[in-house]
Amino acid sequence: MSEKVCIGKIVGVYGVKGWLKVRSFTSPPENMLRYANWELVREDGNRSSAKLRSGKPQGKGIVIALAGVDDRNLAKSYVGCQIEIESSELPALEEGEYYWRQLEGLTVFTSEGVNIGRVSHLIETGANDVLVVIGSAESIDKRERLIPYLPGQFIENIDLDKNLMVVDWDPDF
């Protein structure tokens, strides 16, 4: 069985017929609508299966209809749920491509072998993605560094098996 991947969160209700507003974590946001079999994770950790009946872009977000949810009151009970799918449902990537979740947690070393921390998360800036690297007990210091995710320019190597990334980065920055 593959691991679960969070692809979005239900953030509100939309209309009176049970539709829900969703914050998508996929890129582009409407890609989340490709997956019909969801697992909803409530804030208390309880899980339940859900089937996507319909969905569409609406304004700057996404709205969805779940099978069996046809009124606003029932829809309200789903607000706050994380939406997960099996990682095996995600499209296969080309060589050298990675999902953000694969990069998060990697230990980051400079070309000179200096440990500068771990990838905490990534930020989408429009121009390019940015790694947020946070220092740890094993790293040179506890600073937070923002490193542009530009393979071939700043990113020299990624080894998922060894859980590490090598960057061309001055540790003083």
Swiss-Prot record:
* UniProt keyword terms in alphabetical order: Chaperone, Cytoplasm, Ribosome biogenesis, rRNA processing
List each copy of the PRC barrel domain by range.
95-173
The UniProt entry, under InterPro entries, shows: PRC-brl_dom, PRC_barrel-like_sf, RimM, RimM_N, RimM_N_sf, Transl_B-barrel_sf
Ubl conjugation as a keyword of this entry, yes or no, is no
Please give the coiled-coil regions recorded for this protein: none
Q: Name a single GO cellular component.
A: cytoplasm
Q: Which Pfam families match?
A: PRC, RimM
Domains (record comment): The PRC barrel domain binds ribosomal protein uS19.
PANTHER family documented for this protein: RIBOSOME MATURATION FACTOR RIMM
Its subunit composition reads:
Binds ribosomal protein uS19.
Q: What is this protein called?
A: Ribosome maturation factor RimM
Q: Which organism is it from?
A: Hahella chejuensis (strain KCTC 2396)
What is the primary gene name for this protein? rimM
